[in-house]
């Protein structure tokens, strides 16, 4: 009615409500519509490892981002998943305003392996809760250039995010540092290289890459924490790291209880360094 209203005002019949919306809202809507069109037009299909009405587990290749970043034209893993669900009639971004399919676990661009995505909000909440409670057991394979302290062990250290998207690791506690625990098991050794299975007992940014480098067994090809000289000598410029298995260690009496005990494996490790018999 031409007057500024308060939160407590109650509308009456024939009242006129005027909305004053920032121009940035319309610019965002325009960009969002363009993004929707890009997703709809993606023809690439995800490499599906497991799927049901609630979740989809896919294999992420190296060089692909999980989420959209600065490279607007490049399809991300979640874009490809959304496009696949759109083609199957399970998701329509132009009609769905309350929920968008979302990934539950993230991998670095050059890490390969299994990624879980939820098809609905209830499943997203439950999977995220499982992950927080360490009920989703994720194991990794990696090729390391260096020597592990033993064939099998559990290493503890302290972790802090640093500058330039790097993390710092130290042996003793200090201000701002949080404890990390990493379990490793050597599967095979060839010369100065080892194929290892890693179990994250805690899960922090770059934990595997930074912690293994700290104990003297950096991941081959890792440009942030690895041995640059060795990487260059063998021509390996992306980390040889794969999230190769997921196990649902959950109770069977919850909404996603049918997943209890289910174990999934990546179809391949995707390593560019050969020589190891990876199954």
Label every model-predicted segment:
Residues 1-2, 215:
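Short strand-turn-strand beta-turns centered on an Asx-Gly dipeptide
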